[in-house]
Amino acid sequence: MATAMDHPQGKDFTDLATLQLAYDRLLHQAQHQAAFLGTASHELRSPINQIISLHQLILEDLCEDPAEEREFIAQANQTIQTVLKNLDLLITLSKLDIGTLQPQPQPILLAPLLTRVQRLVQMQCVNRHCRFSLGPVEPSLSVQTDTAWLEQVLVMRIEAALAQGSPQISLTVADDAAASDVVIHLGANPGEAPDSAVAALSPEFRYQLATRLLLHVGATLERLGTAASPNSHLGLRLPRPASQELLPRNR
């Protein structure tokens, strides 16, 4: 056992270095969290300001006719629905961060999940004139993750690429039988962001949210794009199940 004679002035410098490292990490996490909260506040404030502006036009009788007034009311209603949806997402993410909501990792078949993601984004892609392609997936290929949250991550990243005006998005799987991981590749050609009538989360913030969610699905993120467009090619590395037996049905 170490004594005061083992360390000058009775200090264990190894322990002090460990404490300093832990302090630096916590400080970095606190700064990152503060920056994230600042960004989240800005993202929510923008659509709220839009709602206030629409109501102000109505209250000051600046509408040309009743039809325009109804249009402004409809826009405000659609925007507030977007705000509530975004608030629900942020609240859920905070519950995951503090542990009051626990992800449920389990062995799942990857092909049905990716097919479901394709169905969820297909209409959005058609409306944005974006070509979406899903590469072939081995029917028996499985990963260890939380089905619902992985699905949410993939949808959010595809929606972020759509919001940036990407004309083509691809989802493929790299399956090396000798590797312990499976990599889902998401490629999106750069495009010109279209104007949106309804205020929504910015593409950059969508990427931030999806990255935070990745921590809870057991995945690691690899940015394979260029320095000018780091999110144009992303790799999501997921572990294989310890056992291939008794795979549950995907939710």
Model regions and ranges:
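Primarily the dimerization/phosphotransfer
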Residues: 24-57
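Conserved signal-transmission helix
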Residues: 1-32
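Short acidic helix/loop segment immediately C-terminal to the autophosphorylated histidine
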Residues: 58-67
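Short alpha-helical segment of the dimerization/phosphotransfer core of two-component systems
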Residues: 78-83
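Glycine-rich/acidic phosphate-handling loop/turn and adjacent ATP-lid/helix
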Residues: 179-208
